[in-house]
C-alpha cells in the first residue's frame, strides 16, 4: 500500500510546503536486517549509557542540566545532535537532488538563527537562568503569569514538534527498515521515555552526542566518496550533475522554491527566530558551567551544523550523478524507488554497499531518538519546574518536583505514541511550521526583550506574548495549508503559507505598546530592577548559587 512520506516534515520546518521535490508516494521497503542489527547495537549501547547516567542523577540539577558539568565542546556536539535531523539530512539532499542550488539556500535558513543565539542570547541566558528559559523571562517580572505563558509556549511547541516527529519516525522507519508503522511509533516512544525517565539530561546529552558523531561520520564518508568519483573537483561535480539532470543548467540557478517575496521573508524569519525560541535548544545552555562555555557551545554547534549542511549539498549532487542515472534505483515508471527522499539512502548503497546502507538507515533512526528525547525533557521541565514548583505548588521539594517531571515524561510519551498512531495518514506538515512560528512569535520576543529592554513589564510581556501565539495559530489555520488542503475550503482567507512575518510583528508591537502604556506601580518596580538583572547577565555574579525562582 502506497503512503505519503511525511517523515521530512518531522524535522525540516516548512519543507513539506517548499517544493514537490520533497514529497511523494513511497512504498514500504523490504526488511533491512543490516540496518536493524546496527540499530540494535546503538540501542543497547545507549541504554547502557542511560543506566550509567541513572546512577549519577541524584538531584534536580543533575536531572534537568546534567549538573552543569557538560563542556562547551560536548554541548556543541549535543546541540548539533539535537538540531540536525534525519529528515533534514534526507530532505535537503532530496531538495538538492531535484532542485540543485536551491537546496543549499534552503539549508542556510537553518543556520542564520545561530549567530543570533551566539551574540544575543547564549551568554545572558546562561547567567540569568537555571533550568528553563522561563527562569530568564520571569527574572524581574511576575513569576506566575510569565511562567504560565512561557510554559504554554514551550508545551505547544513541544507537542506540535513531538507529534510531527513521531509520525515522521513511523513513516521513515517503515520506509528504511521495513518495520510496521505502529511498531515503529511504539518503539520510538518507549525508548524515548527510558532515556529521559532514567537518565535525564545526562543520558539525553550523550545520546545526542553519539548521534551527531555517527551522522557526521556517515555524511562525511558519503561526501568523500562522491568527491573521489569526480577527482575532488567541484567543477567536475557540478558539470557532471548538470549534464545528467533533467533541468540541466537550471539546477545552478536560485529562486525556484519560494516565488512570493512575502512568503520568502516570512519563511526566513520563522526559521531564524524560531530556532532562537525552541525550548529544547535553549535548555541545553544550562548544561554548561558558565557563559563562556555557553558561547563555546554555540560556536562549536554552528561549525558542526554548517559542515553538515555543506555535506548534504555534496551528497545531493552526488545523488544526481550516481543515483539518478542508475536504473537499479528506479521503479518501472522511472521514479526513484521510495520517493525523492530516498536519494541519500540510495547514494549510501551506491558508494558503500549494503553494509553502509544499513549504517545510514540506523543513524537515521538514532537521530529521531535524539530529537524526541530532547523535546520530552523540555516539555517535562516546563510542567514540573515552571508550572508545578513555581506556580501551583511553590516551595515544593526537589523530590516532589522530580516526581512530577518523571510522571510528565510518561504522560508525554503515552500521548505521543497515541497521537502518532492516530495521525498516521494525516497531513502533519503544518505542525512543524506552526511550532516554529509559535517559537518565533511567543518565546523569542519575550526572551529577547526581557534581557535587553529595560522598559518591559509583565503586562506588556503577557499581552504581547499571547497575541503573538494566537496570531500564529489563527493565521496558520486560515492559510492555504490548513484552510484549503486539510479543511477542504476553496480559497484561503489568509493568502500566505508562513505566518511568522505577521505574528512576530504583532508580538513585538504588542509587547512594546502594552509595556509603554503601563504606568502601574508594579510596572515601575519591574523597570527599576532591570539594572540589577543587567549586571547579573553581564557578569554572571551569583550564577553559581543560582537565583531562587
Swiss-Prot record:
Membrane topology of this protein: Multi-pass membrane protein
Gene Ontology terms, MF aspect: acetate transmembrane transporter activity; glycolate transmembrane transporter activity; symporter activity
Provide a GO biological process annotation: plasma membrane acetate transport
What are the TM regions of this chain, as residue ranges?
33-53, 77-97, 103-123, 148-168, 183-203, 206-226, 262-282, 303-323, 355-375, 404-424, 428-448, 464-484, 493-513
Principal subcellular localization: membrane
Keywords from UniProt, A to Z, are: Cell inner membrane, Cell membrane, Ion transport, Membrane, Sodium, Sodium transport, Symport, Transmembrane, Transmembrane helix, Transport
Q: Write out the annotated subcellular location.
A: Cell inner membrane
Q: Which GO terms describe its cellular component?
A: plasma membrane
UniProt xrefs under NCBIfam families: PRK09395.1, PRK12488.1, sss, symport_actP
Q: Which PANTHER family match?
A: CATION_ACETATE SYMPORTER ACTP, SODIUM/PROLINE SYMPORTER-RELATED
Chain's role: Transports acetate.
The family assignment reads:
Belongs to the sodium:solute symporter (SSF) (TC 2.A.21) family.
The name under which this protein is listed is: Cation/acetate symporter ActP
Q: Which organism is it from?
A: Salmonella gallinarum (strain 287/91 / NCTC 13346)
Lineage in the entry?
Answer: Bacteria, Pseudomonadati, Pseudomonadota, Gammaproteobacteria, Enterobacterales
Amino acid at each position: 500500500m502506497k503512503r505519503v512520506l511525511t517523515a521530512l516534515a518531522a524535522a525540516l520546518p516548512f519543507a513539506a510546503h517548499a517544493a514537490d521535490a520533497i514529497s511523494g508516494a513511497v512504498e514500504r521497503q523490504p526488511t533491512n536486517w543490516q540496518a536493524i542489527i546496527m540499530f540494535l547495537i546503538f540501542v543497547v549501547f545507549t541504554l547502557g549509557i542511560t543506566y550509567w547516567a541513572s546512577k549519577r542523577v541524584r538531584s534536580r540539577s543533575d536531572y534537568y542540566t546534567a549538573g552543569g558539568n557538560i563542556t562547551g565542546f560536548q554541548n556543541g556536539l549535543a546541540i548539533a545532535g539535537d538540531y540536525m535531523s534525519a529528515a533534514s539530512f534526507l530532505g535537503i539532499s532530496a531538495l538538492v537532488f531535484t532542485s540543485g542550488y536551491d537546496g543549499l539556500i534552503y539549508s542556510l535558513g537553518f543556520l542564520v538563527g545561530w549567530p543570533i543565539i551566539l551574540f544575543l542570547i547564549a551568554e545572558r541566558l546562561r547567567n540569568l537562568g537555571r533550568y528553563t528559559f522561563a527562569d530568564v523571562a520571569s527574572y524581574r517580572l511576575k513569576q506566575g503569569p510569565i511562567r504560565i505563558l512561557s510554559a504554554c509556549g514551550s508545551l505547544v511547541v513541544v507537542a506540535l514538534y513531538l507529534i510531527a516527529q513521531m509520525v515522521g519516525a513511523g513513516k521513515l522507519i517503515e520506509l528504511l527498515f521495513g518495520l510496521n508503522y505502529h511498531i515503529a511509533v511504539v518503539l520510538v516512544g518507549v525508548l524515548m521515555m527510558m532515556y529521559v525517565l532514567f537518565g535525564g539530561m545526562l543520558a539525553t546529552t550523550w545520546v545526542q552526542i553519539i548521534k551527531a558523531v555517527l551522522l557526521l561520520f556517515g555524511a562525511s564518508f558519503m561526501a568523500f566518496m562522491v568527491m573521489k568519483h569526480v577527482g575532488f573537483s567541484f567543477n567536475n561535480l557540478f558539470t557532471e550533475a548538470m549534464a545528467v539532470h533533467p533541468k540541466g543548467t537550471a539546477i545552478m540557478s536560485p529562486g525556484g522554491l519560494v516565488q512570493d517575496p512575502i512568503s520568502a521573508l516570512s519563511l526566513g524569519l520563522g526559521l531564524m527566530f524560531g530556532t532562537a525560541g525552541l525550548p529544547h535548544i535553549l535548555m541545553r545552555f544550562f548544561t554548561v558551567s558558565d557563559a563562556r562555555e555557553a558561547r563555546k557551545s554555540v560556536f562549536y554547534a554552528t561549525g558542526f551544523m554548517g559542515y553538515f549542511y555543506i555535506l548534504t549539498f555534496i551528497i545531493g549532487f552526488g545523488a544526481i550523478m550516481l543515483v539518478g542515472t542508475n536504473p537499479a534505483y528506479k521503479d518501472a515508471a522511472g521514479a526513484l524507488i521510495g520517493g525523492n527522499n530516498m536519494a541519500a539512502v540510495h547514494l549510501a548503497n551506491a558508494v558503500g554497499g549494503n553494509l553502509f546502507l544499513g549504517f545510514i538507515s540506523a543513524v537515521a533512526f538514532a537521530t529521531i531518538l535524539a530529537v524526541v528525547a530532547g523535546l520530552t525533557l523540555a516539555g517535562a521541565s516546563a510542567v514540573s519546574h515552571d508550572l508545578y514548583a513555581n506556580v501551583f505548588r511553590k516551595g515544593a521539594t526537589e523530590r516532589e518536583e522530580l516526581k512530577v517531571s518523571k510522571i510528565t515524561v510518561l504522560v508525554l510519551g503515552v500521548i505521543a505514541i497515541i497521537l502518532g498512531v492516530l495521525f498516521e495518514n494525516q497531513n502533519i506538515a503544518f505542525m512543524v511550521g506552526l511550532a516554529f512560528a509559535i517559537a518565533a512569535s511567543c518565546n523569542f520576543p519575550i526572551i529577547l526583550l526581557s534581557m535587553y529592554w529595560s522598559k518591559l513589564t509583565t503586562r506588556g510581556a503577557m499581552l504581547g506574548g499571547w497575541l503573538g501565539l494566537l496570531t500564529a495559530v489563527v493565521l496558520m489555520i486560515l492559510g492555504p495549508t490548513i484552510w484549503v488542503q486539510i479543511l477542504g475550503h476553496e480559497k484561503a482567507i489568509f493568502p500566505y503559507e508562513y505566518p511568522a512575518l505577521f505574528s512576530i510583528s504583532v508580538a513585538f508591537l504588542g509587547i512594546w505598546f502594552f509595556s509603554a502604556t503601563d504606568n502601574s506601580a508594579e510596572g515601575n518596580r519591574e523597570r527599576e530592577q532591570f539594572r540589577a538583572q543587567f549586571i547579573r547577565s553581564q557578569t554572571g555574579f551569583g550564577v553559581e548559587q543560582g537565583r531562587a525562582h
